[in-house]
Amino acid sequence: MAKEKFERSKPHVNVGTIGHVDHGKTTLTAAISHVLTKTYGGEAKDFAQIDNAPEERERGITINTSHIEYDTPTRHYAHVDCPGHADYVKNMITGAAQMDGAILVVASTDGPMPQTREHILLSRQVGVPFIIVFMNKCDMVDDEELLELVEMEVRELLSEYDFPGDDLPVIQGSALKALEGEPEWEAKILELAEALDSYIPEPERAIDGAFILPIEDVFSISGRGTVVTGRVERGIVKVGDEVEIVGIKETTKTTCTGVEMFRKLLDEGRAGENCGVLLRGTKRDEVERGQVLAQPGSITPHTQFESEVYVLSKEEGGRHTPFFKGYRPQFYFRTTDVTGTIELPEGVEMVMPGDNIKMVVTLICPIAMDEGLRFAIREGGRTVGAGVVAKIIA
């Protein structure tokens, strides 16, 4: 079969498999690839190709991840699968693979296990918006009541972490049997694909969001005023738009009087573009790196938040020793470092390199943030951890 060319016209959705070790995440990933390419065309990936996950580095952290792609009639999916539990933790916290939705794989022979719970908690903390459940290995369970019991348990567990446990789709299937080509089980994979299509809404494209540009540099151009430069994170800024400067100092309002890219004047700057924005009446010393330029009212500055953090291991170039409460590192948001203090959960005295932990961070000056924002933890310019804002406190 000829290689299909990448269809730009279909909506692109990012998904991934999560769940306990050996519950069948990689087998399911292979089964989805196999059944969908058989049904709708494309190129299938087998278990060995997916299992042999290449090493990637995201912010200095080594993560093994497999990426596969598949199509349904209406969408193009990019799917991420990780071989080890630690890879999941790192992947979700660094946002190396941002998921629009996750497929939680639970072996019906085991029911929910410790990592099932941990992956659900992580999904909640890092802002995975939708979860679909695939109960795997159902060919090995003859007792219909047992399957119902496992399904109930999984739904309750999801509800415990504020996912709509009673309403989300649960598909009972067998990834291995589907991979072996048994029609009744292949049908379950198609049912899963339909659930992905209907239950996970089309993600908002970066360009459709509220405008935000993290400021990297500030220049003053004689006779014209102050220019800030950076890469537009989302949205569009047009000449004449009112914008806010948020973070570090008091929030101020100004107007965009010009946009330029590669020394050419433009009418607008769009998500993904590096550009300079000319600000009316703003003095050079009123803006600095680390602030953001944003659509008024779309983002606010905060100093205190709950976060989920992964602490780099010694092998990854992280700390060699644990840290304790009272630890004061730098927190690197977008373009700048801000000092902050940490509060550990009750009963936790110290944090070891290689751990993941929930902590409350208090910064010495406010940063423009919303839930889901990623950051690095640094000591003297060296990254020692990665985190995500789970909940804003103040």
From Swiss-Prot:
HAMAP family: EF_Tu_B (MF_00118_B). It catalyses: GTP + H2O = GDP + phosphate + H(+). It is found in: Cytoplasm. One of its GO terms (molecular function) is GTPase activity. Residues 174-176 are annotated as: G5. One of its GO terms (cellular component) is cytosol. It holds the Pfam family GTP_EFTU_D3. Keywords: Cytoplasm, Elongation factor, GTP-binding, Hydrolase, Magnesium, Metal-binding, Nucleotide-binding, Protein biosynthesis. GTP hydrolase that promotes the GTP-dependent binding of aminoacyl-tRNA to the A-site of ribosomes during protein biosynthesis. The lineage of its organism: Bacteria, Pseudomonadati, Pseudomonadota, Gammaproteobacteria, Alteromonadales. Residues 136-139 are annotated as: G4. The gene is tuf2. The keyword Magnesium applies. Residues 19-26 are annotated as: G1. This is Elongation factor Tu 2. Its EC number is 3.6.5.3. GTP binds at residues 19-26, 81-85, 136-139. Signal peptide: none annotated. It comes from the Bacteria. Mg(2+) binds at T26. Residues 60-64 are annotated as: G2. Residues 81-84 are annotated as: G3.
